[in-house]
Amino acid sequence: MGGVTVRDVDAQKFIVAYAAFLKRQGKLPIPGWVDTVKTSASNELPPQDADWYYVRAAAVARHIYLRKTVGVGRLRKVHGSTKNRGSRPAHHVDASGAVDRKVLQSLEKIGVLEQDEEKGGRRITQSGQRDLDRIAKTTVDEEEEDDE
């Protein structure tokens, strides 16, 4: 099989694999408030998963890989959800901008993303693309081993 890219891998499996890679690597800077903050105004409680920041970073990296340039506003819309307003009609609420902004800044610090001066927003770097493709390849290899 030729070059395997992120597009060729199931999204959920890739995000879990890349989040595990980021945690194992230990270079991703994590803010001190991640264990207490909610990720959106539509949520009642903070995330139950202790490693949710790594999962969000992996999801953001994959999202930007697939779409070239993405800003904080677009990520807020993507990670937002429906707010339960009781007996009133539900409405979409964007996710926390601070969380997505800090994730982008963390990925920038480890060299996965860079700022796009012309269009605005962030784009994937060559080293970041190489890392993501390598993780995608290992994910496909693990799937093939499981099939045998």
Swiss-Prot record:
Keywords: Ribonucleoprotein, Ribosomal protein. Signal peptide: none annotated. One of its GO terms (cellular component) is cytosolic small ribosomal subunit. The keyword Ribosomal protein applies. Residues 79-90 have a biased composition (Basic residues). Pfam families: Ribosomal_S19e. Residues 130-140 have a biased composition (Basic and acidic residues). GO terms for biological process: ribosomal small subunit assembly; ribosomal small subunit biogenesis; translation. Coiled coil: none annotated. Residues 79-98, 116-148 are annotated as: Disordered. GO terms for molecular function: RNA binding; structural constituent of ribosome. It comes from the Eukaryota. PANTHER family: 40S RIBOSOMAL PROTEIN S19. Belongs to the eukaryotic ribosomal protein eS19 family. This is Small ribosomal subunit protein eS19. It comes from Emericella nidulans (strain FGSC A4 / ATCC 38163 / CBS 112.46 / NRRL 194 / M139) (Aspergillus nidulans).
